[in-house]
Regions:
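Conserved HGGG/HGGXW glycine-rich cap/lid loop of the alpha/beta-hydrolase fold
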Residues: 1-41, 77-82
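Flexible "cap/lid" subdomain of the alpha/beta-hydrolase fold that forms the substrate-access gate
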Residues: 33-75, 81-187
């Protein structure tokens, strides 16, 4: 399951290796990506179809639509990681194993027992927005920014064109960008 801003096509170099190892591999476009349809693309549109459990249902439905009742595993990258994790957590009878990349999964949240007597504690710690704004070159948190109306407009109508926008986006995340400091993996 791909991440953001990606498509099933993102797995094109991984799929042959898995197939060569004997697996039947599929990589769908997740709901709202690629050529998927059935919801409003309007910024103010209903977001309920994009709830995490709907993405999990999509994965389970795809497995069943392809005629399987269980699969060897589900792989998730970036936004696909929590979807894959919840697939394996909620339906271990369907998804026999899980691999997660680029996004940690902390497990299910604790159940809110006794909330009538013990009110939830407010979040503590420094504000990420204040910390980023205080940098010598002020920045915005990308996930927060992507949820704003200006970001929506930027992505739908990039002045430089979609190709140049995505090329710059991926360059900014790459080891080729001078301000990015990747660290080699041990082993």
């Amino acid at each position: 399951l791909h991440g953001f801003p990606e498509l099933a096509w993102s797995w094109r170099k991984v799929m042959p290796a898995l197939a060569a190892a004997g697996y039947h591999v599929i990589a769908p476009d997740q709901r709202g990506y690629g050529r998927t349809t059935g919801w409003s693309a309007d910024y103010d549109g209903d977001l309920r179809p994009f709830r995490l459990l709907n993405a999990v249902r999509d994965a389970i439905g795809l497995v069943h639509a392809l005629g399987y009742r269980q699969v060897a595993g589900v792989f998730g990258h970036d936004f696909g990681s929590p979807v894959a994790a919840w697939c394996a957590l909620l339906r271990p009878d369907v998804f026999q194993s899980v691999a997660l990349m680029s996004a940690p999964f902390g497990g299910p949240p604790a159940l809110p027992f006794d909330t009538d007597r013990h009110k939830p504690k407010p979040a503590t710690g420094p504000s990420i927005h204040a910390a980023l704004a205080a940098l010598p070159r002020p920045r915005k948190h990308y996930q927060w920014y992507y949820s704003t109306r200006p970001a929506n407009e930027d992505m739908w109508h990039c002045p430089q064109g979609v190709h140049a926008f995505l090329r710059a986006y991926y360059h900014h995340k790459s080891a080729d960008w001078a301000e990015n400091r990747p660290y080699p993996l041990a082993g």
